[in-house]
From Swiss-Prot:
GO terms for cellular component: host cell cytoplasm; host cell cytoplasmic vesicle; viral envelope; viral outer capsid. Belongs to the phytoreovirus outer capsid protein P8 family. This is Outer capsid protein P8. Gene3D superfamilies: 2.60.120.170. Pfam families: Phytoreo_P8. InterPro entries: Capsid_hemagglutn, Phytoreo_P8, Virus_capsid_a-hlx_vir. It comes from Rice dwarf virus (isolate O) (RDV). GO terms for molecular function: host cell surface receptor binding; structural molecule activity. The lineage of its organism: Viruses, Riboviria, Orthornavirae, Duplornaviricota, Resentoviricetes. One of its GO terms (biological process) is fusion of virus membrane with host plasma membrane. Keywords: Capsid protein, Host cytoplasm, Host-virus interaction, Outer capsid protein, Virion.
Amino acid sequence: MSRQMWLDTSALLEAISEYVVRCNGDTFSGLTTGDFNALSNMFTQLSVSSAGYVSDPRVPLQTMSNMFVSFITSTDRCGYMLRKTWFNSDTKPTVSDDFITTYIRPRLQVPMSDTVRQLNNLSLQPSAKPKLYERQNAIMKGLDIPYSEPIEPCKLFRSVAGQTGNIPMMGILATPPAQQQPFFVAERRRILFGIRSNAAIPAGAYQFVVPAWASVLSVTGAYVYFTNSFFGTIIAGVTATATAADAATTFTVPTDANNLPVQTDSRLSFSLGGGNINLELGVAKTGFCVAIEGEFTILANRSQAYYTLNSITQTPTSIDDFDVSDFLTTFLSQLRACGQYEIFSDAMDQLTNSLITNYMDPPAIPAGLAFTSPWFRFSERARTILALQNVDLNIRKLIVRHLWVITSLIAVFGRYYRPN
């Protein structure tokens, strides 16, 4: 398949996508038999078995998009599409002109070979996308759902290297401890921390490190009390018993210098961000567990997992990505939502390296090549490739053009990608 055919076919896909979006979904007309054949031939060469727009016009291009993304991230990614021969040929494409003449040329008035390189055209999006400066964007994100709605602490808990997951801790906490063991866990509406022990723990000061997942939380209207249950299971090695004569137990958090009481009817509101919880145990106990029960929300100015709002204090900067980033936004959101962001990024890094390798003679990665930007920052990657002084300039230009077409195709297909 020639470069020209790829360019014309992707322009055809964009026209189809707009046409389907604008129609009511009950009918799908306007494509000639030649158009169907051209698309079928293209996907046959990519080993893509079926095209979604033929079988179900209500989900235009979704199946096709999923298969294309699967192809990009599969073991075939270093195959036919990445070879020099695929991009060297300018043979006459076999795409029918009927649909292109009807739906594309009157709007664009540009040669088909330039369509994908001009992403500001109306066939990509039916309406103009508003431009947001980084400051405005950050402020809008700060008002977004993660900050304004309650969240369950157990949904934030993440199992990391050297740390047992939240639910597996239930069985561990139900097992009598061999020695003193501090713990910090979460369940619905509650965060629990303390020390398990078979022997008495003397009264005094104890410090608990707030893990990263909890450091982004604040709590309002919280009761703080001693307990011995976790997800309905009894915690072994702690006691919740007390008498009226017991000395008070208090604690402090980094964001509040006041001593906050434990085991009272007081309703407390505080932030868990910033470091450690310092507990002053008023009376000796054979192990103890403190529960914080209240309404938890994400800290807008602390959550590294969502948005840091750092851009509010930065000057707006423009990134020259030829507007391709705008059209990849939907795709990137889908990847993040289904946990495939890192997988796809790794695949694109391998794809880019394989593409460059195929242009070298003998095939190899050029010395000094190292990408510091993510795959969707096309202009930065192009700058890195064009800076390879030990590679012929014409070869560098071909690599960038080849990568641009692949990125453009991802922008076309990615808008309809759904993980399931």
